[in-house]
From Swiss-Prot:
The entry's keywords: Chloroplast, Membrane, NAD, NADP, Plastid, Plastoquinone, Quinone, Thylakoid, Translocase, Transmembrane, Transmembrane helix, Transport
Function: NDH shuttles electrons from NAD(P)H:plastoquinone, via FMN and iron-sulfur (Fe-S) centers, to quinones in the photosynthetic chain and possibly in a chloroplast respiratory chain. The immediate electron acceptor for the enzyme in this species is believed to be plastoquinone. Couples the redox reaction to proton translocation, and thus conserves the redox energy in a proton gradient.
Alphabetized InterPro entries for the sequence: NADH_UbQ_OxRdtase_chlpt_su5_C, NADHpl_OxRdtase_5_subgr, ND/Mrp_TM, NU5C-like, Proton_antipo_N
Gene: ndhF
Name this protein carries in UniProt: NAD(P)H-quinone oxidoreductase subunit 5, chloroplastic
Cellular localisation: Plastid, Chloroplast thylakoid membrane
GO cellular component, one term: chloroplast thylakoid membrane
Organism classification: Eukaryota, Viridiplantae, Streptophyta, Embryophyta, Bryophyta
Organism whose genome encodes this protein: Physcomitrium patens (Spreading-leaved earth moss)
Domain of life, source organism: Eukaryota
Length: 720
């Protein structure tokens, strides 16, 4: 057992070696490396697969032994400081290792086909391996400094992968936005780390938690300062896990390749923030004020993400806001003390969301052959519809992922989400109401995405490249009405417009894709892309039973609580009780969920007649109110809750205005004064030089005249 633990460094080391070898060969031998790109891809998949096998072995040892293992060695030490590096293995670490490696391997297999036509194929696998290695190093870290190092590596990799197609202006802007937004959180994280080192004198988790616990119990620490430092620590997860108000980078991250979207939203970047809050849970639980802030940030994020996702037209951005909402659920659970439910939802959501994103990638990959390679076309659900007939495996797996994310039993997310909703009600009726309403919204927008994408008729061939035609919110093309709306902030009733890319021609006519013929109808993806989808359906169906409330245990009614007990044994968790109580509480949430599905079916379903008969079935005043209501919802969703608009006006334009004002002040006031003084001196010298004639008598006259003037001034000055 100990032998296995001593070699756990292999888990992050293997994908790290893969990224280094690919990067070095790509730098010094680019032609030969690109010619052997399939071999390098297999090499990356093989090394990460070995890491996955080790991860499963470690998880099995943790299930059997249920102990915490640390391996440390001194890196920097003197009389005053002894900084150690190493790794920490506990149930939380083992679960995260399996989660990261399994999703990572499936994403790599998927990427082999998805990125096959891309010139950056080899570079993509180098970034992918480094991204996975960074996240694995993060979850194995035993101290704050080591976590911060890998935390920054994760951020760097996300920057590289979001901006992978850096020649596309939108991708370049998106990676910069993600980088700058996360810098805010990382700065707070660094200050929080330094603050707790000042309080406890240690970076090691075990020592830090014990010392801080003793300081709080003995009232030997300033709680105001401790709360402030804890909030600074929490600022890091707020940014990394896209929590309000630093969530704005997440939808823009969809500019990266779809496999990376699956990895970011399932097992790496956004999961890092949740993992950190879980790792620091023994610290945060001693500070009730911070726990309250965490819970409310999570609740606001969950509800906000769900409302913004309601009318998204971009397939990937709709799923991105879904991720934001589900991360809010996890943060809410951790904030109310239900750590098991939060981590449980992290696991179930990861596999379900990976399935959904890879399914969306399969759709995009197929639709690209019809509409071209512009994201505003191939990701726009207004061009889709009826894809289940052409892509049955993708459609079925996407539907299973939708069932899970909506919380329909017996799929995975049902068990975790319902537990969070129930625990929220036990903690606060307000938080419980928010989580319950969010569940209904989730069911609505997820089935809206499914119906617009896979049901009905294929709409792209009806459009005839008339991108100015709107499509109603119900998902039907309207070829009789032109877009006459010119207001930047108000969209016309409930219309979804085809947005064209200003670089559309360059995107669609890339010479690299010139040999690919456009098809009239989409077709199912190849086996390399379908295999990960089929594999991910298994955890989507069955992993929820890991935390199902079966026989009562000592500290919880499920296996997951028992595995996590050594990590959180000091926590007083809110629990929803036994199987019967859980089932009774699930009735309310399921009723809300099925209501959301029913509304989505009426508005977007394949047999929907409500929109066509709207004017016949309801009174004019009600129709007008409904139009205003739907218009508000769509405007709110389209403009992302106006938060991006606010940030753009206050921070972006405000900063530019300040910079322009400072530039004007520097150029015309500071430089003007200095340059003006120099010019004045120059003209003064030029004027005086003509008084010099070379005659001594003239100089004596000037000297005597000057003395007389000075005496005159001195005499009259003394009198007055």
């Amino acid at each position: 057992m100990e032998f296995i633990y001593q070699f756990v460094w292999i888990v992050p080391f293997f994908p790290f070696i893969a990224s280094i070898l690919i990067g070095v060969n790509l730098l010094f031998f680019p032609k030969s490396t690109k010619s052997l790109r399939e071999i390098w891809a297999i090499f990356s998949i093989l090394l990460l697969s070995i890491a996955m096998i080790f991860s499963f072995n470690i998880l099995w040892q943790q299930i059997n032994d249920n102990i915490i293992y640390r391996y440390l060695w001194s890196w920097i030490f003197d009389n005053k400081i002894d900084f150690k590096i190493g790794f920490l293995i506990d149930p939380l670490t083992s679960i995260m290792l399996v989660l990261i490696t399994t999703v990572g391997v499936l994403v790599m297999i998927y990427s082999d086909s998805y990125m096959s036509y891309d010139q950056g194929y080899v570079r993509f696998f180098a970034y992918l391996s480094l991204f996975t290695a960074s996240m694995l190093g993060l979850v194995l870290s035993p101290n704050l400094i080591q976590i911060y190092i890998f935390w920054e590596l994760v951020g760097m990799c996300s920057y590289l992968l979001i901006g992978f197609w850096f020649t596309r202006p939108s991708a370049a802007n998106a990676c910069q936005k993600a980088f700058v937004t996360n810098r805010i959180g990382d700065f707070g994280l660094l200050l929080g780390i330094l603050g707790f080192y000042w309080i406890t004198g240690s970076f090691e988790f075990e020592i830090l938690f014990k010392r801080f616990n003793d300081l709080v119990i003995n009232h030997e620490v300033n709680l105001y300062f401790a709360n402030f430092c804890a909030l600074l620590l929490f600022l890091g997860p707020i940014a990394k896990s896209a929590q309000f108000p630093l969530h704005i980078w997440l939808p823009d991250a969809m500019e990266g390749p779809t496999p990376i979207s699956a990895l970011i939203h399932a097992a790496t970047m956004v999961a890092a923030g949740i993992f950190l809050v879980a790792r620091w849970f023994p610290l945060f639980q001693l500070l009730p004020f911070v726990m309250t802030i965490i819970s409310w940030v999570g609740a606001i994020t969950a509800f906000l993400g769900a409302t913004i996702a309601l009318a998204q037209t971009d397939l990937k951005k709709g799923l991105a806001y879904s991720t934001m909402s589900q991360l809010g659920y996890m943060m809410l659970a951790l904030g109310i003390g239900s750590y098991q439910a939060g981590l449980f939802h992290l696991i179930t959501h990861a596999y379900s969301k990976a399935l959904l994103f890879l399914g969306s990638g399969s759709v995009i990959h197929s639709v690209e052959s019809i509409v071209g390679y512009s994201p505003n076309k191939c990701q726009n659900m207004a061009f889709m519809g009826g894809l289940r007939k052409y892509m049955p495996i993708t459609g079925i797996t996407f539907l299973l992922g939708t069932f899970s994310l909506c919380g329909i039993p017996p799929f995975a997310c049902f068990w975790s989400k319902d537990e969070i909703i129930t625990d929220s009600w036990l903690y606060s009726s307000t938080l419980g109401s928010i989580s319950l309403v969010t569940a209904g919204l989730t069911a609505f927008y997820m089935f809206r995405i499914y119906f617009l994408t896979f049901e009905g008729d294929l709409r792209v061939n009806l459009n005839k490249v008339a991108f100015t035609y709107p499509v109603s919110i119900w998902g039907e093309l309207n070829l009789n009405k032109k877009n006459s709306n010119k207001n930047k902030f108000v969209l016309n009733k409930y219309d979804i417009f085809f947005e064209t890319d200003q670089n559309e021609n360059q995107t669609d006519n890339l010479s690299f894709f010139s040999d690919i013929k456009k098809l009239k109808y989409p077709k199912e993806s190849d086996n390399k892309m379908l295999f990960p989808l089929l594999v991910l359906t298994l955890p989507t169906l069955f992993i929820g039973f890991l935390g199902a409330p079966f026989p009562e245990g000592q500290i919880g009614s499920d296996l997951l609580s028992q595995w996590l007990y050594p990590v959180f044994k000091s926590a007083e968790e809110i629990t929803s009780g036994n199987w019967l109580e859980f089932g009774l509480n699930a009735i309310n949430s399921l009723s809300v969920v099925f209501s959301g599905i029913f509304i989505a079916f009426i508005l977007y379903g394949p047999f929907s007649l409500f929109p066509q008969n709207l004017e016949k079935n309801i009174e004019f005043s009600l129709e007008k109110n409904l139009n205003s209501f739907f218009s508000f919802i769509y405007n709110w969703s389209y403009f992302r809750g106006y938060i991006d608009v606010y940030y753009n006006i206050v921070f972006v334009k405000g900063t530019r205005l300040l910079a322009q004002s400072l530039s004007f002040f520097d150029e015309w006031i500071i430089d003007g004064f200095v340059n003006g003084f120099g010019i004045l001196t120059f003209f003064e010298g030029e004027s005086i030089k003509y008084l010099e004639g070379g005659r001594i008598s003239f100089y004596l006259f000037g000297l005597i005249f000057g003395m007389i003037i000075l005496l005159f001034i001195g005499f009259f000055g003394a009198m007055f």
